């Protein structure tokens, strides 16, 4: 009887397959700063109108980001920018607020994608299939476009905030915890747009409370001393 030789094992190739249709890229800007909203953008690019030079927004100059911002808005099939406010960040925490902003950005798209690609390693809850891609802003053009829209939108917000609170220097540091920003927090305390749930801001708020309480105590003591009645003078003589 002829012996049966074992056949070589054949592994089935698993090729990625995705349903045809529109794909949206999603990214955020502003998770790390001490002030302001976190901004997210969602973009569906038009394959018939390619955009040259799309890349991670952090690797581009401000001028190049501005130029690409306008081109993306003009050529994309649709795009959406959304935010989570400072109050939402302080209530939810920065991670959950970021997921909220991303969810709002996707919901704001005029066209519904069949798939969403998100920069990073976490996904917001969405009603369409989604995939998280680490360093996606450098690998996927739609995510690169979203990173540019989010970054430029937030930088413009910081420029407006600088006009309202020039002593913090928001136009230069964009709300990040630079030495300049930390010194301004030390000197002026927190403004309404600072994130109270972030430790450096919480410390600045606490210092302000202590200083105000100390000033109130000192003022009260000084006022008490100033209105204290004078001691009665000794009689200089008796009168009949």
Curated annotation (Swiss-Prot):
Manganese or magnesium. Binds 1 divalent metal ion per monomer in the absence of substrate. May bind a second metal ion after substrate binding. Its EC number is 3.1.26.4. GO terms for molecular function: manganese ion binding; RNA binding; RNA-DNA hybrid ribonuclease activity. It comes from the Bacteria. It is an enzyme of class 3 (hydrolase). A divalent metal cation binds at residues 27-28, 119. PROSITE patterns: RNASE_H_2. InterPro entries: RNase_HII (IPR022898), RNase_HII/HIII (IPR001352), RNase_HII/HIII_dom (IPR024567), RNaseH-like_sf (IPR012337), RNaseH_sf (IPR036397). Its cofactor is Mn(2+); Mg(2+). It catalyses: Endonucleolytic cleavage to 5'-phosphomonoester. Residues 21-210 form the RNase H type-2 domain. GO terms for biological process: DNA replication, removal of RNA primer; mismatch repair. Belongs to the RNase HII family. This is Ribonuclease HII.
């Amino acid at each position: 009887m002829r012996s049966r030789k074992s056949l070589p094992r054949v592994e089935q190739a698993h090729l990625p397959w995705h349903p045809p249709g529109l794909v949206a890229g999603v990214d955020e800007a502003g998770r790390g700063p001490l002030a302001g909203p976190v901004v997210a953008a969602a973009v569906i690019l038009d394959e018939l109108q390619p955009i040259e030079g799309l890349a991670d927004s952090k690797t581009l100059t401000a001028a190049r980001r501005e130029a690409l911002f306008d081109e993306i808005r003009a050529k994309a099939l649709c795009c959406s920018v959304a935010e989570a406010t400072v109050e939402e960040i302080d209530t939810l925490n920065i991670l959950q607020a970021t997921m909220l902003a991303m969810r709002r950005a996707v919901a704001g798209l005029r066209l519904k994608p069949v798939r969403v690609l998100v920069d990073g390693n976490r996904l917001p809850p969405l009603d369409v299939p989604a995939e998280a891609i680490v360093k996606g802003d450098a690998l996927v053009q739609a995510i690169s476009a979203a990173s540019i829209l989010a970054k430029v939108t937030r930088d413009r917000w910081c420029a407006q905030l600088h006009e309202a609170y020039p002593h913090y220097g928001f136009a230069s540091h964009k709300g990040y915890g630079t030495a300049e920003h930390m010194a301004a927090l030390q000197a002026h305390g927190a403004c309404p747009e600072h994130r109270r749930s972030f430790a450096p801001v919480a410390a600045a708020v606490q210092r302000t409370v202590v200083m105000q309480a100390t000033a109130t105590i000192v003022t009260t003591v000084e006022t008490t001393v100033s209105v204290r009645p004078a001691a009665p003078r000794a009689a200089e003589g008796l009168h009949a």
